[in-house]
């Protein structure tokens, strides 16, 4: 039912040239476009931070093992790198381990809340960079704004902020490259 309503709404908006009028307005009003974009990004940030603070989830499985390996590395315990150690088995985690190792000097060991809130910040900036990329490609401003609005509605990515994996950071660094 939701899909049918969404299709009907898009059909109505296209048929009545509402998208064209909105895009024309946004193209002529830079301040309005930036204000709407920033409000949408703030909504994504607030919803992500609220999710992180309300769930208070702790790392488990791989997330914990990488944080544990970073702590061990800072304390001279290299068992995670030895034969059958976690990092020796899962070398794909070395990038995340390096980031957690460096930042761990500042925020401490097993600081789940910091990493989760950092994920929220990276999600917000990823959506901003998506918007900037669409501007560089000279796509209509409505496309740039629609991407961020759909980001508000796409809960799985925001909910993913509680997982301390490299996916959020990877997409963030990939879009900023």
Tell me what each language-model feature is.
Residues 156-169:
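Short acidic/glycine- and proline-prone juxtamembrane loop motifs at membrane-interface regions
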Residues 1-51:
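Start-transfer (signal-anchor) and selected internal transmembrane alpha helices
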Residues 88, 115-122, 166:
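Alpha-helical transmembrane segments of multi-pass integral membrane proteins
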Residues 64-88, 95:
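Extracytosolic helix-loop segments that constitute the early lumenal/periplasmic catalytic or substrate-binding loops
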Residues 44-45, 144-155:
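Short helix- or helix-capping micro-motifs
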Residues 75, 80, 95-118, 138-141, ...:
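Juxtamembrane segments of multi-pass membrane glycosylation machinery
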Residues 47-67:
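Helix-to-loop transition at the C-terminal end of transmembrane segments
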Residues 117-138, 176:
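Transmembrane-helix motifs of polytopic, lipid-linked glycan transferases
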């Amino acid at each position: 039912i939701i899909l049918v309503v969404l299709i009907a709404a898009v059909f109505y908006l296209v048929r009545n040239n509402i998208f064209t009028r909105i895009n024309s307005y946004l193209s002529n009003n830079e301040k309005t476009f930036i204000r709407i974009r920033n409000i949408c990004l703030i909504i994504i940030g607030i919803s992500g931070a609220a999710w992180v603070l309300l769930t208070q989830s702790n790392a488990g499985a791989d997330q914990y093992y990488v944080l544990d390996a970073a702590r061990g590395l800072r304390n001279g315990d290299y068992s995670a790198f030895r034969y059958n150690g976690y990092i020796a088995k899962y070398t794909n985690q070395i990038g995340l381990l390096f980031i957690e190792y460096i930042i761990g000097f500042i925020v401490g060991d097993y600081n789940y809340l910091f990493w989760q809130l950092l994920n929220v910040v990276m999600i917000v900036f990823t959506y901003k960079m998506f918007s900037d990329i669409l501007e560089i490609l000279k796509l209509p401003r409505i496309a740039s704004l629609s991407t961020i609005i759909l980001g508000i509605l796409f809960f799985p990515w925001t909910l993913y902020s509680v997982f301390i994996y490299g996916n959020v950071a990877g997409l963030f660094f990939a879009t900023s490259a």
